[in-house]
Swiss-Prot record:
Gene from which this protein is expressed: wuho
Official protein name in the record: tRNA (guanine-N(7)-)-methyltransferase non-catalytic subunit wuho
Biased composition annotated in UniProt, kind: Low complexity: 46-68
Pfam family, one: WD40
Function: Required for the Mettl1-dependent formation of N(7)-methylguanine at position 46 (m7G46) in tRNA. In the Mettl1-wuho methyltransferase complex, it is required to stabilize and induce conformational changes of the catalytic subunit. Required for binding of nanos mRNA and repression of translation by the mei-P26-bgcn-bam-sxl complex. May cooperate with mei-P26 and nanos to derepress the BMP signaling pathway. May cooperate with mei-P26 to suppress expression of a subset of microRNAs. May cooperate with mei-P26 to regulate bam expression levels in germline cells during gametogenesis.
Additional note from the record: Wuho means 'no progeny' in Chinese.
Record localization: Nucleus; Cytoplasm
SUPFAM superfamilies hit by this protein: WD40 repeat-like
WD repeats by residue range: 96-137, 184-223, 227-265, 324-364
Organism lineage: Eukaryota, Metazoa, Ecdysozoa, Arthropoda, Hexapoda
InterPro entries assigned: Trm82 (IPR028884), WD40/YVTN_repeat-like_dom_sf (IPR015943), WD40_repeat_dom_sf (IPR036322), WD40_rpt (IPR001680)
Tissue distribution of the protein: In testis, it is present at high level in hub cells, a niche for germline stem cells of testis. Ubiquitously expressed in all testicular cells throughout spermatogenesis. Ubiquitously expressed in all germline and somatic cells of the ovary.
Length: 424
């Protein structure tokens, strides 16, 4: 089971199990929620090619409940889709209680929310999320479980990558249009970017590669950013020509992705499995946050600065313990002053808040009982709730096999036996 957490001004979006919560980062109060219906109403799909499927999105129900919002508005249920969306009356593939939230992404204009699901019903759900209630626009089936989501800069379409390396484009205007297969990798894609001018799609995978693909002519690869020696777990767009990447090879790097040129390589204390970047000064100063794999410090905060001659440097480093070792950390997000971290404690979901300046647990502005309220909202405290065991990230690392040593040992024994026979 996955837990997703992200910050989209002015709210934290938290997905777990069958629910998505919208939380006010200031007082940690829930002011809106979405619950997946038992049946997503997928009619099934026909094959468009061996890699692609047409998505005939049909009936689905969206339950969106608004809590006590910051403005004090009452809760409301949003069970009906918007005009032009899908109806809630048709039947689909049947009840699939194991279906759960996989990935969540907000559109740049803040109007749309994309949710992918895993389990028996793999789907891309598109919601109209603002101004108040979340209303379902479409539910389109996915051939495989998703690995990453990314909206384009004008929110007109969304990219979905899956765990076999394929990348599909879904239209957010014609919400029932079938997907378009854009590109493919030979291994799982962990993150994806779409440049602001929509001229390039940037993907990273388990095979150490960062690929820059031209759009819309995605058969044409513009460049590669090569140098990582392990999986590339995260990407972040810095400027029109620069990206940051984090990898299991214990490095944080900055690239000119147009030229495929590495501009900075910074050593990390442990493999990196998540990367987030905040802009502090436009196109000049950034804060990169890295989640480590099995290290005494859970996160590293790095200040990236760009000089006038286009050189990059790390000018400040802060390591955040976040009580690593006492619980299994799975994900995190940042605001201007706090770090929000999700994980498992005794196989139960937990959420902790830390001060971004000190790295210590946040003390001010955290109401009593907030954690129980959030966990109740996600259904994590319900009777019969399944245990929460974060993804085993050890499978991300390459498996290296040494059959040369065995061969040399056998050869050595054979030579010794031949020499003994000659002497005998």
């Amino acid at each position: 089971m996955c837990t997703t957490i992200s910050f989209a001004e002015p709210e934290i979006v938290l997905g777990h199990g069958r629910r998505v919560l919208f939380v006010n980062p200031d007082d940690l109060q829930i002011f809106k929620e979405i619950e997946l219906p038992p049946d997503l109403g997928l009619k099934g799909h026909t094959s468009q090619s061996q890699e692609s499927c047409t998505a005939a999105a049909a009936a689905s129900t969206a339950t969106a409940a608004s809590g006590q919002a910051p403005g004090g508005k009452e809760q409301q249920l949003a069970n009906q889709p918007e005009e032009g969306g899908t109806s809630a009356s048709a039947s689909g593939l049947g009840c699939a209680t194991s279906t759960s939230v996989q990935n969540v992404a907000y559109s740049p204009d803040g109007q749309l929310l994309a949710v992918t699901t895993s389990g028996k019903q793999k789907a891309l759900l598109l919601y109209r999320s603002r101004p108040e209630n979340a209303r379902l626009l479409s539910a389109r089936p996915l051939a495989r479980a998703s690995s990453a989501l990314r909206f384009c800069s004008d929110s007109s379409s969304i990219l979905v990558t899956d765990k076999t390396g394929d990348c599909y484009q879904y239209d957010c205007v014609e919400v029932e249009a079938p997907p378009r297969l854009l590109l493919g990798h030979l291994s799982v894609v962990y993150d994806i970017l779409w440049s602001e001018d929509q001229q390039h799609i940037i993907t990273c995978d388990r095979d150490d590669k960062i690929r820059v693909t031209n759009y819309p002519a995605t058969f044409d690869i513009h460049s590669y950013c090569l140098g990582h020696r392990e999986f590339v777990s995260g990407l972040a767009l810095l400027t029109e020509q620069h990206i940051a990447s984090a990898s299991g090879d214990k490095t944080l790097r900055v690239w000119n992705y147009i030229q495929g040129k590495e501009l900075l390589q910074h050593e990390l204390p442990a493999p990196a499995v998540r990367l987030l970047v905040r802009q502090l000064e436009p196109e000049k100063v950034f804060q990169a946050a890295v989640l480590f794999y099995e290290h005494v410090d859970a996160l590293g905060l790095y200040r990236l600065e760009r000089s006038s001659d286009d050189t990059w440097s790390v000018t400040a480093t802060q390591l955040v313990c976040a009580e690593a070792g006492s619980w299994s950390i799975s994900n995190f997000t940042l605001t201007s002053d706090r770090i929000y971290i999700t994980g498992a404690e005794n196989e139960r979901l937990s959420l902790r808040v830390y001060d971004i300046a000190t790295g210590q647990p946040a003390s001010s502005g955290v109401p009593e009982g907030w954690l129980k309220m959030v966990l109740d909202g996600l259904g994590a405290n319900e009777e019969g709730a399944p245990p929460f065991i974060p993804e085993d990230l050890s499978v991300w690392f390459k498996k290296r096999f040494d059959n040369v040593s065995d061969y040399l040992e056998r050869k050595k024994r054979r030579i010794e036996e031949q020499q003994q026979q000659k002497c005998g």
